[in-house]
Amino acid sequence: MSLLTPTTSEVVNQAFVEHCCLAYQMDHEGYHGFDHWMRVLHNGRLLVEGEHANLKVVELFCLLHDTQRRNEHVDPQHGQRAAQFAGTLRGDWFELTDDEMDLLTEALT
């Protein structure tokens, strides 16, 4: 599994990605599994370079946005569940300021 990581990342490491994979209840071979997360992560990092956005928040969004999906099609609450999941990870898997957590929650929901 390629993480497509930059030289350094405050949040993306093998253990964190594996933890997110374990939390995913669907088939990773589907549309919204691991390969999708890695494509979104790659594109998110490209956008950060041009927009000067918060890399940590963008990386977390990219990895977490579909982790709580329950189906491949219509699942309007998956973002809210992802935001709740992010809240359970904060402090153990990553550190965010309150403002950064608000940004992540807004992006996920």
Regions of interest found by a model, annotated:
Residues 9-13, 33, 37, 60, ...:
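Generic alpha-helical segment signature
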Residues 9, 13-18, 41, 79-87, ...:
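An amphipathic alpha-helix signature
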Residues 15-44, 66-71:
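Active-site flanking loop/helix segments enriched in acidic
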